[in-house]
Amino acid sequence: RNGVTITSFPVIHIHNGAVGYRLDYAGRSVVFSGDTRPCRHLVEACDGVDLLIHETFPTAAVLSQKAGMPLNVAEMIVNGAHTSPAMAGMVFERAGARMSAMWHLVVDHETVGPVFSEMRTRHDGPVVISQDLTVFNVTKEYVVARQAIIGPFRWPVVGASNTQGPPMSAPLPPPQWWSTALITD
C-alpha cells in the first residue's frame, strides 16, 4: 500500500513461527530480524538492503556475570535462542547492508567494548547499538542513526486486571527446516 512492501520470512527462535521483516519503500530497504539465531533466510532477505537491524545478545560470559547466572545457562540462552556478538558480526558481513544495528542488547560502560570487540572479529563495516528511541534516516546518500529527543518520561498507568495467561507447556521439537537454515559459522 502507498508503495510500501513488507515481506516476512522465517527465523529461528525457540518455537516455530518466529519471523523477521523486510520493508521496502521508494528504493530504500530495512530488514528487522526479530528474535533469532543466525539464519540463512534472514541473510537472503538482506539482498541489496540499506539497513539491517539484528538482535544481538551479550557474550555468555558477560550475561553470566551481569545477570548472576551460571555460565552454562547463559551459554544456552545466547547460543540456543539468540545471537552472540561474533555471530551477529558474521551475519552483518554476509548480509552486506550499508549499515547494521545491534538491538535487544543491554550494555553498560563495562560491556559495550567487549560486545563491539567480539562483533568486530567478523565484521568491520558500519554498526551501531540501537536502543529505545533510536531513529534511522535512510536516504540514497547515507544511513544515519540518532536518538530522538522526547518530553518528560511518564510511566504508564496500569489498571487492575484479573486476566491470567494460559499455562506454560513444554516446547515442541524444532521444525525440520531449522537444521538447514541455521548458520553455525
Locations of regions flagged by a protein language model:
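Cap/insert and terminal regions of metallo-dependent hydrolase folds
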Residues: 20, 26-29, 37-134
